[in-house]
Curated annotation (Swiss-Prot):
Protein name from the UniProt record: UPF0358 protein ABC2396
Species of the source: Shouchella clausii (strain KSM-K16) (Alkalihalobacillus clausii)
Gene3D superfamilies xrefs: SO2669-like (1.10.287.750)
Domain of life: Bacteria
Pfam families: DUF1507
Family, per entry: Belongs to the UPF0358 family.
InterPro entries: UPF0358, UPF0358_sf
HAMAP family: UPF0358
């Protein structure tokens, strides 16, 4: 594979991971805005499942050397920070 093809694949992989992360972020934002039922088990389960799936996607992309480990960790840490905000908000209600 040429360097350009590898770079293109890496950029595409990162963009796909970012898109999946943005979907999870939207779920978090919706829950923060509409915190009508604090700690809804179903909602928590969906978020946990999506986060786990994304972490597996990121791990796979890192192992294929399509995404740098640091970039993958940044995606997850940003979402974990937002999840922590959601948890704090639900505890206040």
């Amino acid at each position: 594979m040429t360097t350009n093809a590898v770079t293109s694949q890496s950029e595409k992989a990162y963009a796909l991971l970012q898109a999946d992360a943005e979907k999870i972020q939207k779920l978090i934002e919706v829950q923060l805005e509409n915190l009508t039922m604090p700690q809804c088990p179903l909602y928590e389960e969906v978020l946990d499942t999506r986060m786990f799936g994304l972490s597996r996607e990121i791990d796979f992309a890192i192992r294929l050397e399509l995404v740098e480990e640091e970039k993958g960790k940044m995606i997850l840490s940003e979402l974990e920070r937002k999840l922590a905000l959601l948890h704090e908000a639900s505890m206040r209600k």
